[in-house]
């Protein structure tokens, strides 16, 4: 971890820990210019363990006299035996959804509010297209007719596939649906205008060009196009633009314009956007220097709470979210400053312990792993774990009494729920059997695995000493208080911890323990415990300050959290070495550190953006699931929808999420109501599916099968063809149902009775206008007579197939030859383009400016950290 250290002396005789610190100090200047997030995650985290002490002692062995070597080797031996003697297994489950990488912080910070892309075109499904008209004898006329056709014709065949196409179209509309529209940004010049007027977008302009140049266009329409221009109402900040749109496209764009998400922005909104506890915190000085224009707008973030309850029964997903929150929180916890010099503190501790020759085995361990990096790391871990509600596990060695005494401070200030139970029980049992029970001469506690009571709860009932029992009672009842602040569930620390008074309670208990006789233990044992307690009690003032500092930083950063802080144990844990807790207790200085305003705003913005994106993606997923059900997509893989939802949240490794959680998530999403805008858009698509199908060149809507030949009919769009334009008089059977049941008896019976039958459903419909290429592909003898007697250029062949098992049929219509067929394709007529009914006026604001980062208007500073006060209006750190 990056940290600052003053007054550190480097001795020539550097051990392994010092070398690690030197590397950090060398990198310090380089890291100063790096952003806070980069600085925190600039290198792999180092955890200080007791193994480092073994290396340290081994180094000292080489440089000491033979006599000291023997004594220190004895220490090593004893340590190893103790490590092997007590090993408590920490519950560790593998988590499949997330690998903690530094990239997760970048992913979180890259989630920005959806900037409405600068819209250059309106949303369109249709475009007008010119098609030739055929005479009664099959010849093309010189005239053309305009029809509305699909811009992007990707309609598949098969009823189910077509419904899936509409679901994908809906998904596309949801993706493209703008938060706001400014028509002025997309308007282009109308080339045919008399007075340099503008139309709404380039496609409208190109349609106007094509119609203007069409010889058959009426003069009145040309005159109208020449008059087409924008109409500005400057006093109302409104502008109207002419547009040419299919009625369905007009309905979409008009809906987008009427339901924009932008809202007026003023100073009050920005002021209220800042978390209330930051506004009211006297340590932060906030100013707004700028008056916003009347055209200022913003998009309110979507911060609905707890619609999926991922903490409830979604272990893998919850673990991923808490892990990413933990990494983010660590990046914003301030670094400790002006820690006590490690070397000076170790020397002072050695003097207090009277360890001239380091002869007492147990007390040599008191100095293990103490360094400023471990202290800083511990400070960050504790605050970040509480902010993200990550469960912690404790690593310690039972023979290191100093670690256990530091652990007593840790268990006093951090609620029990923050530790995984197995780890908590192991630590409490070690404290009880090493310190508490021996002090009173009580028998060693034999704890049964699975006991509903913790060792401290049992010890509280059995301890006669009031002060010790009182402290045990506090620890046993140290839980977060759940408080709803600004609509967000917060986990708040006990007031006695926030003001540091609980440390006096801890010290009273420790003093009582140090005064006991330890009747069943040797004198050296008693003396070791007493000296360990003395080391901690000498720093009473600093420990009170440290507790207040920890609580203040936690609560200040907690004000920037926007999602409910649900407390559920996580699958994986954050490891905490008790030696690093000792480092924190022994090295904490008197310099106050509080988060900078820029850090707070950054943390708040990242939380808001993630939360808003989370809710928007939920809305999308709920809408798609509802649409799939309404479209009767019985085979639609809901898992794919849920996977897509998780991918859009950016922090999940979706391939590793267990299937059971996917399906549980699907069930939760199904229970949620659809957001109004998304529901209205779906209803627009649902009502106009028929019109969209008609406009496709790729599919027909059915086929008529007969036992006897049916004469082909003349069609204006295709000549003489086997195309039917209505199904009047035919009995209709649904093709999808027919294929699903596989019962063709009904069709057979009808055909045998000489009754044509209409099979209704989406079928391939392909036209090919190149007759030469068609004949080249087929046996020329089929068309011999036709080619001989007629002009090839006037032929209009049509290829269609009923299903994959049937043959392809080519039918040719020309002149007076009237062929017959036993099948007809049912193809609905696309909508004709009519200029008057397609001309619409669209209205939007003439201009406005959308601001995404509201906090950019706020200039913020802090008081001098030394003067910073906590919630009780007293300085955070009083020990000067």
UniProtKB/Swiss-Prot annotation:
Region (Hydrophobic): 394-414, 422-442
Spans annotated as Disordered: 1-38
InterPro entries in the record: Rotavirus_VP2
Keyword Glycoprotein: no
Subcellular location field: Virion
Site feature (Interaction with the intermediate capsid protein VP6) residues: 220, 224, 228, 839, 841
Chain intervals for the UniProt region annotation (5-fold hub): 1-80
Chief place where the protein resides: virion
Pfam families per the UniProt record, alphabetical: Rota_VP2
Keywords: Capsid protein, Inner capsid protein, Repeat, RNA-binding, T=2 icosahedral capsid protein, Ubl conjugation, Virion
GO molecular function, one term: RNA binding
Post-translational modification: Sumoylated with SUMO1 and SUMO2. Sumoylation of viral proteins seems to have a positive role on viral replication.
Domain of life, per lineage: Viruses
Coiled coil: none
Positions with biased composition (Basic and acidic residues): 20-30
Domain observations: The N-terminus binds RNA. It is necessary for encapsidation of VP1 and VP3. The N-termini of 10 VP2 molecules form a cylindrical hub underneath each 5-fold axis of the inner capsid.
Record's function text: Inner capsid protein that self-assembles to form an icosahedral capsid with a T=2 symmetry, which consists of 120 copies of VP2, with channels at each of its five-fold vertices. This capsid constitutes the innermost concentric layer of the viral mature particle. It encapsidates the polymerase VP1, the capping enzyme VP3 and the genomic dsRNA, thereby defining the core.
Subunit structure: Homodecamer; each decamer is made up of two conformers of VP2, called VP2A and VP2B. Interacts with a VP1-VP3 complex. Interacts with the intermediate capsid protein VP6. Interacts with NSP5. Interacts (via N-terminus) with NSP2.
Official protein name in the record: Inner capsid protein VP2
């Amino acid at each position: 971890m990056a940290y600052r250290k003053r007054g550190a002396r480097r001795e020539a005789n550097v051990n392994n820990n010092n070398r690690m610190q030197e590397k950090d100090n060398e990198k310090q200047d380089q890291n100063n210019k790096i952003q806070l997030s980069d600085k925190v995650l600039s290198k792999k985290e180092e955890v200080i363990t007791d193994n480092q002490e073994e290396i340290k002692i081994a180094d000292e062995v080489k440089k000491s006299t033979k006599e000291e070597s023997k004594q220190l080797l004895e220490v090593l031996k004893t340590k190893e035996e103790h490590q092997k003697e007590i090993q408590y297994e920490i519950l560790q489950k593998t988590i499949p959804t997330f690998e903690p990488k530094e990239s997760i912080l970048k992913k979180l910070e890259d989630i920005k509010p959806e900037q409405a892309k600068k819209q250059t075109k309106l949303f369109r499904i249709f475009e007008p297209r010119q098609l030739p008209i055929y005479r009664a004898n099959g010849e093309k006329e010189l005239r053309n007719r305009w029809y509305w056709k699909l811009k992007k014709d990707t309609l598949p065949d098969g009823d189910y596939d077509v419904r899936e196409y509409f679901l994908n179209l809906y998904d596309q509309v949801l993706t493209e649906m703008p938060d706001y529209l400014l028509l002025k940004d997309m308007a282009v010049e109308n080339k045919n205008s008399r007075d340099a007027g503008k139309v709404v977008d380039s496609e409208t302009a190109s349609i106007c060009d094509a119609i203007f140049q069409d010889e058959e266009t009426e003069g009145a329409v040309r005159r109208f196009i020449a008059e087409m221009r924008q109409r500005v109402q400057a006093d109302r900040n409104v502008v109207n633009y002419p547009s040419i749109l299919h009625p369905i496209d007009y309905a979409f764009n008009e809906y987008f314009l009427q339901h924009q998400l932008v809202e007026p922005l003023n100073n009050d909104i920005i002021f209220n956007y800042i978390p209330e506890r930051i506004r009211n915190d006297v340590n932060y000085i906030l100013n707004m220097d700028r008056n916003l224009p009347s055209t200022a707008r913003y998009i309110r973030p979507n911060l609905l709470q707890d619609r999926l309850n991922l903490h409830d029964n979604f272990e893998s997903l919850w673990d991923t979210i808490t892990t990413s929150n933990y990494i983010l929180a660590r990046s914003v916890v301030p670094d400790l400053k002006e820690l006590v010099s490690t070397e000076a503190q170790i020397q002072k501790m050695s003097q207090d312990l009277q360890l001239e020759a380091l002869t007492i085995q147990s007390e040599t361990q008191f100095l293990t792993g103490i360094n400023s990096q471990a202290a800083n790391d511990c400070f960050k871990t504790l605050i970040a774990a509480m902010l993200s509600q990550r469960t912690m596990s404790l690593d310690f060695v039972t023979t290191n009494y100093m670690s256990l005494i530091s652990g007593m401070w840790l268990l006093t200030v951090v609620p029990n729920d923050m530790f995984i139970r197995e780890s908590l029980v192991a630590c409490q049992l070690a404290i009880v059997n090493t310190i508490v029970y021996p002090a009173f001469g009580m028998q060693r506690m034999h704890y049964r695995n699975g006991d509903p009571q913790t060792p401290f709860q049992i010890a509280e009932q059995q301890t006669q000493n009031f002060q010790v029992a009182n402290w045990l009672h506090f620890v046993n009842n140290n839980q977060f208080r759940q408080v709803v602040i600004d609509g967000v569930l917060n986990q708040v620390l006990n007031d006695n911890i926030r003001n540091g008074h609980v440390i006096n309670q801890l010290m009273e208990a420790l003093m009582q323990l140090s005064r006991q006789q330890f009747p069943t233990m040797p004198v050296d044992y008693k003396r070791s415990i007493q000296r360990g307690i003395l080391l901690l009690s000498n720093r009473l003032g600093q420990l009170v300050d440290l507790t207040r500092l920890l609580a203040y930083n936690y609560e200040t950063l907690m004000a920037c959290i926007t999602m409910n802080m649900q407390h559920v144990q996580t699958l994986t844990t954050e490891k905490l070495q008790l030696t690093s807790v000792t480092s924190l207790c022994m090295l904490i200085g008197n310099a106050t550190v509080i988060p900078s305003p820029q850090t707070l705003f950054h943390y708040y913005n990242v939380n808001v953006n993630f939360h808003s994106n989370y809710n928007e993606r939920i809305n999308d997923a709920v809408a798609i699931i509802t649409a799939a059900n309404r479209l009767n997509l019985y085979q639609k893989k809901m898992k794919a929808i849920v996977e897509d939802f998780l991918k859009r949240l950016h922090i999940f490794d979706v391939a590793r999420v267990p299937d059971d959680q996917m399906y549980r998530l699907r069930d939760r999403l199904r229970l949620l109501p659809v957001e109004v805008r998304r529901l209205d858009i779906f209803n627009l698509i649902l009502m106009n599916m028929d019109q969209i199908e008609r406009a496709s060149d790729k599919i027909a809507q059915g086929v008529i099968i007969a036992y006897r030949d049916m004469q082909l009919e003349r069609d204006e769009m295709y000549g003489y063809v086997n195309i039917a334009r209505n199904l009047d008089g035919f009995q209709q059977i649904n093709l999808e149902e027919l294929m699903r049941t596989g019962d063709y008896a009904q069709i057979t019976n009808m055909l045998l009775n000489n009754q044509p039958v209409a099979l209704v459903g989406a079928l391939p419909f392909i036209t090919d206008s190149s007759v030469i290429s068609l004949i080249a592909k087929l046996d020329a003898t089929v068309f011999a007579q036709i080619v001989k007697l007629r002009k090839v250029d006037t032929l209009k062949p049509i290829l269609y197939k009923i299903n994959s098992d049937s043959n392809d049929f080519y039918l040719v219509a020309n002149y007076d030859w009237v062929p017959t067929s036993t099948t007809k394709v049912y193809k609905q007529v696309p909508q004709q383009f009519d200029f008057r009914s397609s001309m619409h006026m669209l209205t939007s604001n003439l201009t406005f400016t959308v601001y995404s980062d509201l906090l950019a208007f706020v200039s913020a500073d802090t008081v001098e950290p030394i003067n910073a006060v906590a919630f009780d209006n007293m300085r955070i750190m009083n020990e000067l």
